[in-house]
Structure formats: C-alpha cells, structure tokens
C-alpha cells in the first residue's frame, strides 16, 4: 500500500521518464504485490501523456500478471485507449471483455464524442451503443444521458433528443442537475426554448452551470431581454448566485449598449471587470456598438492583457473603419512582446483593406511568412482581399494560388477580386473551376452576379441566377435581386429589370430601386426613372440624393417649375449644408 501511495503521488510531481521508471519498478515486484490501484495510476498516466506504446505495455503487463480480467482495470485501460483516440484498440478490448458495467458503456459513449467524422455518424454510433445497453441488465445513469444528449446536440437530432428526454423521465432523472444541463443546451440549440425552460424549472437544486446553460440558450435564440432577466432571478434563487465570467460573457456577446453598461456596473461592483475573458467580452460589446472610447477605457484599465484582448481591440477598430488606429494598436502589441496569432494577422490585414496601405500589407505578409502563419486559411484569405482592395490583383492571385486547399471563402474572394478589377470572364472561369471541388453559397453567387453586371454579361448573369435558385435551391436575397436589376438596367433591358423589381418577394429596397433608376438614367427612360425616384422618396424622404434623381428627370424633360418645387421641398425636409449645383473650395491659407 505504501508503494501504491507513493506511485500515485509521483504521477503529479515527477516527469515522464521518472514515471516510466516507476512502471519498470512495479514490474519487478511479484504479481501478488501489484495492486489494481497501482496499475490504475499508470493507466491514467499513459492516457494523459498520449503514448500508445505505454498503454500497450500496460495492457501486456496486465495479461502477463494474470490481472487482466479485473473489470476495474479493464475499464481504466479502455478509458486510456479512448483518451489517446485509439478507437480500434478500444473496440477490440471492449469486445473481449466478459463483463461490462455502466462505467464501461459510459466510456464508450463519451469516446464517440471524440471520434472523427460526421456528427450524424457519431450520433448513430452512440445510439447503437444505447440499443445494446437496453438489451442488458445495466441501467443508464446521469453520465450516460449527458454523453448521449451531447451527441444529439452536436448533430441537432431533435427527434432522438426528445426520446432521450422521455427515457430520462422514465428513469426518474428529470430532476438531476447534470443531464438536465445537457438537455437545456440541446433544446436551446434546436430553438425549443420553452422546452429548455421547462427542463430548467423541473430541477429543484440548480447549480450555476444550469443557470448559465439557460442564459446561453436565450442568447442563442436572440431573446436578450429574457436572458438579462435571468441575471436578476439568480439573486433570488436559494443559492443566491451572482453569475460568473461565463454568465456575463454570454450576456455581453449579444446585449444592447444600455444593457451592456448595466452589466459593466455589476461587474465593477463584484470586481469581475479585471477578469480577462469578461473584460474582453466588454471590449467586444463596446466595439460592436461603435463606442470605441469606452472600449479603449476598458482596455486601458485591464491589469493583464493577453493576445485575445489585443485582438478584440484591433478587430473593434478595424470593423468600425478605424484601420489606421488598428494598425497602431498592432504595432503597440508587438512592442509589448506579445506574439500575434492568426486572428491578429487576419484582423490587421482586413483593416489594411479599408484604406490605401499596400506597404503595410507587405510588411504584415512578411511577418506572417516568418512566423509560419501563411498556412492558416483565415490569414491567406485576408491577404487576397487586402491586396485586391488595394488594387494589386497580381499579388492577390499569387496568394490564392499559394493555398494548398482553398476553401469556399478563398474561391469567393478571388472571384470577387477578378470581378472588381474588370476581369468578368476570368471571374466566371474561376467560378466554374470552383464548382468542380466545392458547392457555392449565396455570397459566391453574389460575387458572380456582380462580375456579370460589371462585365455586361447578361445571358451569363441570367443563367447564374437561375442556377442558384433552381439547381442549388438557394433563396435569392435583396442583394442578388439588386445585382440582377443592375445587370439588366445597364444593358438597357429596362422592362425586364422592372419585372424583376416587381417580382421580389418583399418590398424593393432602396438599393434595388437605386439600381433601377440608375439604369433608366443611362438609357434615358424618364418615366420609369421618375417612378423609381418617387418610390425612393417615399422610403427615404430625408435623403438629398433622392431629390436630385427626380429633379434631374424633371430638368431633362424641361419641367423647371416642378424641379424648383422639388428643391424647395428638399430644403424643407433635409439638412444639406451644400447648395445644389454648386461646388465649394476651402481656402485654408487664411
């Protein structure tokens, strides 16, 4: 027993070589002295170190010592195989086991979660194990349900999850906190928030993890006010929970600025604002709401800042059009000897794409190459977009061709790059090449339609739109209709553009109407142009450009009085510091 105690202690204190030496020492002791607990400790060690050879050595040693038939040790060995993802060996061991208890089955079920492959395939395998359990005398416990419900959550298998819920109730586990937490996550992901709340209410002794599961479910389903209300209910619970970093991070990820400031006040009161994950969530919330000064104040107040915190600031400024400030923050981050990761590089490159910064892009690319981050798709895709938006198509193409396995974002980026530089036919050729490997999405089709519009490829654009809606069953959105209207309008097919405009499933947006009036203006279709301009004025009566479109139509027909009346109406409804028809030059030498 003394050796067993020392052996277990050394697992936590010594290095790997010392552990293996201890294993050799165990093997020199007669089998009668080798207790199952000692061998169990070595099994845990090997599993945690991911060494298959060590696990197999233990396996052989157990057989040699005649203790292989111990169910306790077999379960430990099975757990070791699953932890190092040697599932073939785990399956073989399982088939050889003469006895199995619920621990054995639970190891297999939770091992399925770690397996590679499609989530539906993993769920199917897990339910095969469940079917076999139900034909034995073994009873499922809360650990079994947690694993099985997790498989349903990952695959969004609603029917199977509901059946598990029924089985859980039948076995009297509906008030158990642990499987109920898994059920709340499952129902939340499936959008059945009423069921999630019902499961939550059935648990009498709730822990904070269960509360957090319901909060995140509300957030996931866009029910921010309800999630915020749960924070108040926590304090009235018998355990008087006040939330933790997960609670506040979930709420901050989706709340409005007013609610975010309330949470900030609570965090200050309970001294959570210095916690790195919570402080980072605060930064994100303020940045998303374009409250960059508040975000900076939070950032400056952080005692410890990690790469994630810096990334949040860089992303926040980049997304709000403050590209130069994002670059400055990146430089400051490097001065503090923090190593940027792939998200940092991708964010910085995205910020460079929003202002003329070709030199900065090249500097970042050199750093990316030096640090070996060029293989990350997010970084490579950002390089394509950055070079394209800064007018360097050749570099964008070089970046694309350097990617070993381009994903859909890579292909879409290069298709858009070619289209925006006037290479419409090459853009379509790239699209056809992509179709041999990947299935397009709505963004890909939007880039292709844009290429057709800029290149005047009417028939190709119509075929593309038809392929999207009929073959790929992708529902056209406002942007797709706008591109199609723009394509037809530019080419002079005003009646066809009008038909598309009127066939939209929703009311035409201002973008679609502007594209239509633009085409009418090019081809001098004044009546259609006036109709579109009047529609624009109905939607946006305070936008000066809409008055200009209609006014120009009146002037082109010689209706000066109507144009003058329209300009008076514009001055009454809009604040426009400029005088229409006049250009202004500032004299800054005074």
Swiss-Prot record:
NCBIfam families per record: PPR (TIGR00756)
Pfam families noted in UniProt: E_motif, PPR, PPR_2
Region Type E motif, residue ranges: 512-588
Family: Belongs to the PPR family. PCMP-E subfamily.
First-listed, main subcellular location of the protein, grouped into a coarse class: mitochondrion
Transit peptide: 1-109
Subcellular compartments: Mitochondrion
Example of a GO cellular component annotation carried by this entry: mitochondrion
One GO MF term attached to the UniProt entry: RNA binding
Repeat is among the record's keywords: yes
Keyword list, A-Z: Mitochondrion, Repeat, Transit peptide
Originating organism: Arabidopsis thaliana
PPR repeat ranges per the UniProt record: 141-175, 176-206, 207-241, 244-266, 275-305, 306-340, 341-375, 376-406, 407-437, 441-471, 477-507
Name of the protein described by the UniProt record: Pentatricopeptide repeat-containing protein At2g46050, mitochondrial
Record InterPro entries: E_motif (IPR046848), Pentatricopeptide_rpt (IPR002885), PPR_At4g14850-like_plant (IPR046960), TPR-like_helical_dom_sf (IPR011990)
UniProt keyword Repeat, yes or no: yes
Gene Ontology BP terms: mitochondrial mRNA modification; mitochondrial RNA processing
């Amino acid at each position: 027993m003394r050796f067993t105690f020392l052996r277990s202690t050394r697992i936590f204190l010594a290095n790997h070589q010392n552990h293996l030496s201890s294993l050799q020492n165990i093997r020199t002791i007669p089998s009668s002295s080798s207790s199952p607990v000692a061998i169990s400790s070595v099994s845990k060690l090997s599993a945690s170190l991911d060494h298959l050879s060590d696990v197999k050595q233990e396996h052989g040693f157990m057989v040699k010592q005649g203790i292989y038939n111990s169910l306790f040790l077999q379960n430990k060995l099975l757990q070791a195989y699953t932890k190092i993802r040697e599932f073939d060996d785990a399956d073989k061991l399982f088939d050889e086991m003469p006895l199995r208890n619920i621990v054995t089955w639970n190891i297999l079920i939770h091992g399925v979660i770690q397996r590679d492959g499609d989530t539906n395939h993993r769920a199917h395998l897990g339910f095969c194990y469940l079917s076999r359990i139900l034909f034995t005398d073994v009873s499922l416990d809360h650990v079994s349900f947690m694993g099985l419900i997790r498989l349903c959550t990952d695959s969004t298998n609603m029917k199977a999850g509901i059946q598990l819920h029924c089985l859980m109730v039948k076995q009297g586990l509906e008030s158990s906190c642990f499987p109920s937490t898994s059920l709340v996550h499952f129902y939340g992901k499936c959008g059945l928030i009423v069921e999630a709340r019902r499961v939550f209410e059935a648990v009498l002794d709730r822990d904070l993890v269960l509360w957090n599961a319901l909060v995140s479910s509300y957030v996931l389903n866009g029910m921010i006010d309800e999630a915020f209300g749960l924070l108040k209910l926590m304090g009235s619970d018998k355990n008087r929970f006040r939330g933790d970093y997960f609670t506040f991070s979930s709420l901050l990820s989706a709340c409005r600025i007013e609610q975010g400031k309330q949470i900030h006040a609570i965090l200050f009161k309970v001294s959570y604002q210095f916690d790195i994950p919570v402080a980072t969530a605060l930064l994100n919330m303020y940045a998303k709401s374009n409250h960059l000064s508040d975000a900076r104040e939070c950032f400056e107040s952080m005692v410890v800042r990690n790469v994630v915190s810096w990334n949040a600031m860089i992303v926040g400024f980049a997304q709000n059009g403050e590209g130069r400030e994002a670059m400055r923050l990146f430089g400051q981050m490097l001065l503090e000897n923090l190593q940027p990761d792939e998200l940092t590089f991708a964010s910085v490159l995205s910020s460079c794409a929003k202002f003329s910064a070709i030199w900065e892009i090249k500097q970042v690319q050199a750093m990316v190459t030096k640090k070996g981050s060029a293989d990350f798709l997010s970084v490579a895709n950002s390089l394509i977009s950055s070079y394209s938006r800064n007018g360097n198509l050749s570099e964008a193409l070089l970046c694309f061709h350097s990617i070993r396995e381009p994903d859909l974002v890579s292909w879409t980026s290069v298709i858009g790059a070619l289209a925006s530089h006037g290479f419409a036919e090459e853009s379509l050729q790239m699209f056809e090449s992509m179709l041999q490997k990947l299935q397009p999405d709505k963004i890909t089709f939007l880039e292709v339609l844009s290429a057709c519009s800029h290149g005047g490829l009417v028939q190709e654009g119509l075929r593309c739109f038809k392929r999207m809606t009929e073959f790929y069953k992708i529902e056209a959105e406002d942007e797709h209709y706008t591109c199609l209207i723009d394509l037809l309008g530019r080419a002079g097919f005003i009646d066809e553009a009008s038909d598309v405009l009127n066939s939209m499933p929703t009311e035409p947006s201002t973008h679609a109407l502007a594209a239509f009036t633009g085409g009418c203006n090019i081809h001098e279709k004044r009546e259609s142009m006036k109709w579109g301009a009047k529609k624009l004025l109905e939607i946006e009566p305070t936008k000066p450009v809409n008055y200009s479109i209609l006014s120009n139509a009146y002037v082109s027909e010689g209706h000066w009085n109507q144009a003058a009346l329209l300009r008076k109406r514009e001055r009454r409804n809009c604040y426009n510091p400029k005088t229409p028809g006049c250009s202004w030059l500032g004299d800054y030498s005074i």
